[in-house]
Amino acid sequence: MRRRKQNWLFWLLSICLCLTFGPFQQTVKAESAPLDIRADAAILVDAQTGRILYEKNIDTVLGIASMTKMMTEYLLLDAIKAKRVKWDQMYTPSDYVYRLSQDRALSNVPLRKDGKYTVRELYEAMAIYSANGATVAIAEIIAGSEKNFVKMMNDKAKELGLKDYKFVNATGLSNKDLKGFHPEGTSTNEENVMSARAMAMLAYRLLKDHPEVLKTASIPHKVFREGTKDEIKMDNWNWMLPGLVYGYEGVDGLKTGYTEFAGNCFTGTAKRNGVRLISVVMNAKDASGKTTKEARFKETEKLFNYGFNQYSLETLYPKGYQLKGKETLPVVKGKEKEVRVATGKNLDLLVKNGEEKQYKPVYVLDKKKMTKEGKLVAPLKKGETVGYMTLEYKGDDSLAFLSPDMQKNIRVPLVTTAEVEKANWFVLSMRAVGGLFVDLWTSVAKTVKGWL
C-alpha cells in the first residue's frame, strides 16, 4: 500500500513539473532563436549612433538597383542647400531624358519633349515613383550631363566615407537596359553596386544631413501634373508606409529597388518611441528562394520587429554623473588645488533587453588641457570640457558600428562643475618656496636615513 502511494505521488509530481516548466522552456527557445533573414545581405542599424544591431554578409558587394537614387537625392538636396539649384527652377527634357521617360516598361512619368518641369516635380517623381527619366533630368540639372553626375556620385561616396561602391549611372538601371545610352565612360554590362554596410552608411548620412528627405519619401500617393492632360497617379513603391499593403507603424522611408541583376532590394527606416532604425535587405527572397517584392518587405519587417522588440533607449548615466573614485581632477596654478568633474549630458544608448549592466563608464581626458603630470591648468571656467566619458561593453560581442569613427557617438563631454580662478603671483610664489623646502627636507631626510 505504501509503495502504491509513493508511485502515485511520483506521477503527480511529474505532471506538475511538466505543467510548470514545459511552456517556459518552449518560450525561452522561441525567444533565443536566431533571426533568419532570407536575403543575400542584410543589416539593421541604430540611426542615432550608427551602431549595427544585426548583420548578414554586410561587406559583400551586390547590385543596388533603384536604391541608387538615394545618392541622387543626396546630391540634389546638397545643391538645394548650397543654392546652386532652386526648387522652382525650370527644366526642358533633353532628347535622351525624353526617350527614357517614354519607356513604360521602366518606372517613369512620361515627359513632353517641349515640356517645362520644376525641380520639385522631378524630385517627387523620383523619390515617390522611382521615375527614371526624372532622375536623369535631375542629374543633368546638377552636373550638365549624366556622365559628369556619375563622377559626382562616386566622389561624394568617397567623401562620405563609404567603402565598396561603384556608380555607373544615376538611376540604378542596368546599363544594358539603357539601349546604348549608358553614360560615356561606362560599359554596357556594368551595374551600380554597393555593400549593405555602404548602403546603410549612405542612408545614415542622408538622414543626418538632409532629414527633409522623409517629407517626400513618406508620401504614399501623389498625382504628377494634377489637373493637366499629363497627370499620372504615382503610388509609392515602399509598401511598408502606413496605410499601404505591408504598412508598418513608424515607417517613413526610404527607397526600394529591383533589377534582374540586383533582385528585390529595400533600404527602409522607421521611428518608434524616439528610436529610429535603418534597415537594408539585398536580393530578398521568399521561402521558396525566389526574389519577390513582397519578400523585401517581409524580411524588413523581421528586422524592425527585432530592433524595436529587443532594444530600448536607456539613459545609462545621467547628466552630472561622477565616476566613483574619480570625482575630482588635480589643478595647478589655481586658487583651489582640485576641481570636481561630471558628465555634461545624459549618456543615452539603445540597449538590448537585459544588457543594461554590460556597460562600464570610462573617462578619457583631453591631453591638450593636461600637464605632463596629469593636472589641469587654471584658470578654468565652470562647465569647461576637459575630456569625455565613453563606454566599454562587457557582453559576448564587441560593439560594432558602420565605421570606426562612429564610436564617438556613444560619448558625452566631461566638464568641470565649478570655476577655478588662477592664483595670484604671491600665492604661487609661496607655493613654489614651500615646494622647495619640502623637496629640500625630503632630500635631507633621505640622506640622514642613509647614514643610519
From Swiss-Prot:
Domain of life the protein comes from: Bacteria
GO-annotated biological processes: cell wall organization; peptidoglycan biosynthetic process; proteolysis; regulation of cell shape; sporulation resulting in formation of a cellular spore
Catalysed reactions listed for this entry: Preferential cleavage: (Ac)2-L-Lys-D-Ala-|-D-Ala. Also transpeptidation of peptidyl-alanyl moieties that are N-acyl substituents of D-alanine
GO molecular function, one term: serine-type D-Ala-D-Ala carboxypeptidase activity
InterPro entries referenced in this protein's UniProt entry, alphabetically: Beta-lactam/transpept-like (IPR012338), Peniciliin-bd_prot_C_sf (IPR015956), Peptidase_S11 (IPR018044), Peptidase_S11_C (IPR012907), Peptidase_S11_C_sf (IPR037167), Peptidase_S11_N (IPR001967)
Pfam family, one: Peptidase_S11
Pathway: Cell wall biogenesis; peptidoglycan biosynthesis
Main localization category: secreted
GO cellular component: extracellular region
Active-site annotation: S66, K69, S130
Locations listed in the record: Secreted, Cell wall
Signal sequence region: 1-30
Function: Removes C-terminal D-alanyl residues from sugar-peptide cell wall precursors.
Protein's recorded name: D-alanyl-D-alanine carboxypeptidase DacA
Annotated source species: Geobacillus stearothermophilus (Bacillus stearothermophilus)
Gene that this sequence comes from: dacA
